[in-house]
Curated annotation (Swiss-Prot):
Domain III, AAA+ region, as annotated region: 118-334
Keyword set, alphabetical order: ATP-binding, Cytoplasm, DNA replication, DNA-binding, Lipid-binding, Nucleotide-binding
Example GO molecular function: lipid binding
Highest taxon above the source species: Bacteria
Protein name: Chromosomal replication initiator protein DnaA
Feature: compositional bias, Polar residues: 82-91
Keyword Secreted: no
Listed InterPro entries: AAA+_ATPase, Chromosome_initiator_DnaA, Chromosome_initiator_DnaA-like, Chromosome_initiator_DnaA_CS, DnaA_C, DnaA_dom, DnaA_N_dom, DnaA_N_sf
Gene Ontology terms: cellular component: cytoplasm; plasma membrane
GO biological process: DNA replication initiation; regulation of DNA replication
Length: 454
């Protein structure tokens, strides 16, 4: 057995299964072969159960045919295989694991050997669905891919969970390597940087660790907020950051938070995060959510009527990951029942998700959350007062109600002290103008959405 075992098995599954089934259930799996155990990591428990029930017997049959000696025991888990242990999850992922990374935990620190980029080839700019919520971040990322080490260095992308930040990082990596085949592009999570640093200290290989991280052409580091309250890691990254910038090597970072909002990180590091370009990815607006669903369904070989995509997108609003989870459930129900995809079918398949979302976000909840955020009374939100300290939060609350609930403009107006629909429409347009022009309003709106969607 070797590290191509799962890749060979996945290739056989790809040749036997319908494309829709393979893309939905097999392609997302990541594998770790450890002795006589082959662990398959799935994105969620629903996928684990489905693969176990529908495909495990076939997987075992293929493994028996591929193995000359003892067949590994297959274990299904929720999670991800670590990059250094990951087997090729599908034929398309083999290219992403062709390079070897120094193992600082074992003292193997030869920085001259080829390294693992950790870049997933399937994440590109072409399949990143663009909308108003992310178009600036995508445009900046494309500029970096075409001109690494240029004016947008460092690039700091922030936004809530599941909005596409990691996709953009991999797309940049693929773009850089497309322009320069031998580019040394390295994607990691901040947690991995911390682990490598700790291992290098334990094994007296800190010099090798420093040379390795400072030798890359582009460092793409995800979830930079993980450095919070880790002073040693912050100190090392501070010097790594400076060395890379001095060498015109590209740095791209992502975080759930705006740099200045990351508690537990030194001010000098926060300041450096903003030296280049800091840009937000917002929760996708309705049109983008529809486009994402249509694209993802098409990738799975599934025809989704536009009105069905609109129905789902109108009710599930928080992030792309939530939409993908809903789509996976729809696909599974289609395969299980053979029924056509209609609004009634989707309403039944997603009834618990929709009910949870509608229970979570109500106009009343929005009003209370906005009042608390701005430290004003709920009665002020509902009053006729027109002072800016009250009028602006009221307009924000109206705009949030339009975006996060299914209520009509007249219904929203009625909930805000009997105002008419034109007042609500004006508030929504005004807030959009302010979001485009004023960073603080944009941040307030983003923070409120995050609070209401959590």
């Amino acid at each position: 057995m070797n590290n191509s075992l799962w890749q060979q098995c996945a290739e056989r599954l790809q040749s036997e299964l319908p494309l829709q089934q393979f893309n939905t259930w097999i392609r997302p799996l990541q594998a770790k072969l450890n002795g006589e155990t082959l662990t398959l990591f799935a994105p969620n428990i629903y996928s684990v159960d489905w693969v176990r029930d529908k495909y495990l017997k076939t997987i075992n049959t293929y493994l028996e045919a591929l193995c000359d000696d003892k067949v590994p025991n297959v274990v299904l888990k929720v999670g991800e295989a670590s990059p250094t242990q990951r087997d090729s999850g599908s034929p398309q992922r083999a290219a992403a694991t062709r390079r070897k990374t120094p193992n600082f935990s074992s003292g193997n620190t030869d920085v001259e050997v080829p390294f693992e980029s950790n870049i997933h080839p399937e994440y590109t700019f072409d399949n990143f669905v663009e909308g108003k919520s992310n178009q600036l971040a995508r445009a900046a990322a494309i500029q970096v891919a075409e001109n690494p080490g240029g004016v947008y260095n460092p690039l700091f992308v922030y936004g809530g969970t599941g909005l596409g930040k990691t996709h953009l990082l991999h797309a940049v990596g693929n773009g850089i390597m497309a322009h320069k085949k031998d580019a040394k592009v390295f994607y990691i999570r901040a947690e991995r940087f911390v682990q490598d640093m700790v291992n290098s200290i334990r094994n007296s290989s800190t010099n090798e660790f420093k040379r390795y991280y400072r030798s890359v052409d582009a460092l793409l580091i995800d979830d930079i907020h993980f450095f919070a309250n880790k002073k040693g890691s912050q100190e090392e990254f501070f010097h790594t950051f400076n060395a890379l910038l001095e060498g015109n090597q590209q740095i791209i970072m992502t975080s759930d938070l705006y740099p200045k909002e990351i508690d537990g990180v030194e001010d000098r590091l926060k300041s450096r995060f903003g030296w280049g370009l800091t840009i937000a990815i917002e929760p996708p607006e309705l049109e983008t959510r529809v486009a994402i669903l249509m694209r993802k369904a098409d990738e799975r070989g599934l025809h989704m009527p536009h009105e069905v995509a609109f129905f789902i997108a109108k009710r599930l609003r928080s992030n792309v990951r939530e939409l993908e989870g809903a789509l996976n459930r729809v696909v599974a129900n289609v395969q299980l029942t053979g029924r056509p995809i209609t609004i009634d079918f989707v309403r039944e398949a997603l009834r618990d998700l929709i009910a949870a979302q509608e229970k979570l976000v109500t106009i009343d909840n929005i009003q209370k959350t906005v009042a608390e955020y701005y430290n004003i009374k709920l009665a002020d939100i509902l009053s006729k007062r027109r002072s800016r300290s009250v009028a602006r939060p009221r307009q924000l609350a109206m705009a949030l109600a339009k975006e996060l609930t299914n209520h009509s403009l007249p219904e929203i107006g009625d909930a805000f002290g009997g105002r008419d629909h034109t007042t609500v429409l004006h508030a929504c347009r005004k807030i959009q103008e302010l979001k485009d022009a004023q960073h603080d309003i944009k941040e307030d709106y983003r923070n409120l959405i995050r609070t209401l969607s959590s």
